[in-house]
Amino acid sequence: MTTKYVATLLILLGLFVITAKFARATEEMRSNPPRSLYAVNESSDHRGSISVYDMDAGHRPVKTLQTVRDVSDVRGVAVSGATGKLYVAYRNVSGTGMVYCLDVYNDSVVWNRAIDPGVDRLVINPDGKLLYVPTWEGGSADFINVVDANTGDTVRKVHFSNRSHDAQYPLSGPIFQETKAEDGSGNYLYLIDPTSYAISRIGPYLGILGPYAVDSTSSYVVNNVRGLWGMQVASLKTGEIITATVPDHPPGDAGLLHGIGWTPDQSEVWQNSSGTDPRVYVWDMRNPMAPVLKETLILRSGRGSHWLTFDIKGDYGYVAPVKNSADGTEIFNARTHTSVGVIGSSEDMLEIDFADGKISQVGDQYGIGRR
């Protein structure tokens, strides 16, 4: 075998290896785009599955992950960048509260467990080891469950108020929790220390709380409040609570406006109107304790909404329709406030970013502050 022949073989082998690596990298990018939106589907035909969208390609659908059967009501989603595991809380067709764990790297369901006595909008510790799972707004239990994220086993109960609903773990912590308790304790927002499990609270507010969002330094929290056309803002440092009302709103009782969040730069708070009104209110938050209503957006559907959140960079705002609706989730340019598209119905969604085949950062189901 001549030297020239050997050299040619080595060159061809090198080209083959490079081509194979490029093809593998291209396939990984197609499967996991650098900025991916993972959205748990709510429509009746696909409820509980997860659609993945390429955010940098006009939210092009990339894949749909078939997960578990018999999902009746999706209650929340959380993900750990540290472990690559994603968690979905849901109620099945029998009314049992469940959580399933998905491995983001291979799209497989790792476990699917019933959590007694129920589940609601869960969150995960930044280290990926523990889930904090409310016991359902329609229940009567006076605690939330702390769950081993690796196995689904409940390892602790934290008692404080009944009908626990939305848990949140903002960038600066601690664990936040609201409840739908009718005994007066639902008029407070609870803070739970993730190390000692000591509990403190902010309030009372004007009524029972709904969705809320905390800024990046855990200095301010914005809240939906039952019966209020507007929002309340609390200083977590002083305990002061102010009320910002919508001057021109539909007639009648507000009920509970459902959906609120900071833009990542914290310059604005977006707030959904009622479940039948297609408006989204945009508040100027340059002075968090003196919000100014600056704009009102109108949804394409002409109907109401139930949730909203943002991507990590602040490019997009996502406004979800009422629960289990066939209406799509509308995408807005978060800077210009223009509508730029619609994806399938989902209010349980978050961003996952990839670099070199690994998760580089993760977003949140809430519109938390990121400044």
Regions found by a protein language model. Name each.
Residues 1-9:
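Bacterial N-terminal signal peptides that target proteins for export
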